[in-house]
Amino acid sequence: MGSFQLEDFVAGWIGGVASVIVGYPLDTVKTRLQAGVGYANTFNCIRMVYKRERVFGFFKGMSFPLASIAIYNSVVFGVFSNTQRFLSKYRCGELEAGPGRSLSDLLLASMLTGVVSVGLGGPVELIKIRLQMQTQPFREASHGLKSRAVAAYQGPVHCIATIVQMEGLTGLYRGASAMLLRDIPGYCFYFIPYVFLSEWITPEACTGPSPYAAWLAGGIAGAISWGTATPMDVVKSRIQADGVYLNKYRGVVDCISQSYQQEGFKVFFRGITVNAVRGFPMSAAMFLGYELSLKALRGEHTVRSE
């Protein structure tokens, strides 16, 4: 079998759909905690969102991520799987004849995936965050909290058109530098723990990760990845949310400086609990959907040899 396999992209898309549906409500809470104001903690944020917007508030802007993030995950998993397979084959000659995947192969594949993810996912995350944040209170100069009852955007298409009109095409990549600093190490902490944990959990007699191993290893990897990515995720969310009503940040360093001066060091860990908690079910669904779809597409089964 060649090193390039299209099935990885298809399975990544299916896993991406499952991941978005499972994790979107907590993703909304995470974004509002990091970029919004007026919330004491995670549970206070959940109560406030429900009180103001009911259940629909947790799914605000989900149509765009459901369509786009699924494709984004398709590319992420396709790039990672094919890159590490190519590196292993290049290092060992024939893939089937060589030893198991090395840490260096996984590290390089994860880093490349992080770079690719920003190019494709930057606009996706920007639109998602703008739609999630558009009805939030915001702080204007020294006048305290200003509430916004009317949404700034009528939907994903209107949001894109407004950003391009007001900020140009480059506006779609607002926060790309912060996202790059988040995703390159983030995907290393995402894929590498998953690979080794799934291999460790799966019985030796099984061919490929078992469903339980994919679910558990995926969940743990997601919690680790999102937990460690939280500081730069806070910066990214603030830069991307900036521009809905105000333009207060001039870049990554300025955002870090202003956030630290105004709210202290703890601000960079805002939402870490919901990030880690949300990361488990999202990534568990992602990897389980990916592995099961991959086996189905290849006509394989997780069999136990006698």
From Swiss-Prot:
<keyword id="KW-0472">Membrane</keyword>
<keyword id="KW-0999">Mitochondrion inner membrane</keyword>
<keyword id="KW-0496">Mitochondrion</keyword>
<feature type="transmembrane region" description="Helical; Name=4">
    <location>
        <begin position="184"/>
        <end position="204"/>
    </location>
</feature>
<feature type="transmembrane region" description="Helical; Name=5">
    <location>
        <begin position="212"/>
        <end position="232"/>
    </location>
</feature>
<feature type="transmembrane region" description="Helical; Name=6">
    <location>
        <begin position="272"/>
        <end position="290"/>
    </location>
</feature>
<dbReference type="Pfam" id="PF00153">
    <property type="entry name" value="Mito_carr"/>
</dbReference>
<keyword id="KW-0677">Repeat</keyword>
<keyword id="KW-0812">Transmembrane</keyword>
<feature type="transmembrane region" description="Helical; Name=2">
    <location>
        <begin position="61"/>
        <end position="81"/>
    </location>
</feature>
<feature type="repeat" description="Solcar 2">
    <location>
        <begin position="101"/>
        <end position="200"/>
    </location>
</feature>
<keyword id="KW-1133">Transmembrane helix</keyword>
<comment type="similarity">
    <text>Belongs to the mitochondrial carrier (TC 2.A.29) family.</text>
</comment>
<keyword id="KW-0813">Transport</keyword>
<feature type="repeat" description="Solcar 3">
    <location>
        <begin position="209"/>
        <end position="296"/>
    </location>
</feature>
<dbReference type="InterPro" id="IPR018108">
    <property type="entry name" value="Mitochondrial_sb/sol_carrier"/>
</dbReference>
<dbReference type="GO" id="GO:0005743">
    <property type="term" value="C:mitochondrial inner membrane"/>
</dbReference>
<feature type="transmembrane region" description="Helical; Name=1">
    <location>
        <begin position="9"/>
        <end position="29"/>
    </location>
</feature>
<dbReference type="InterPro" id="IPR023395">
    <property type="entry name" value="Mt_carrier_dom_sf"/>
</dbReference>
<dbReference type="GO" id="GO:0005739">
    <property type="term" value="C:mitochondrion"/>
</dbReference>
<feature type="repeat" description="Solcar 1">
    <location>
        <begin position="3"/>
        <end position="86"/>
    </location>
</feature>
<dbReference type="InterPro" id="IPR050567">
    <property type="entry name" value="Mitochondrial_Carrier"/>
</dbReference>
<protein>
    <recommendedName>
        <fullName>Solute carrier family 25 member 48</fullName>
    </recommendedName>
</protein>
<feature type="transmembrane region" description="Helical; Name=3">
    <location>
        <begin position="107"/>
        <end position="127"/>
    </location>
</feature>
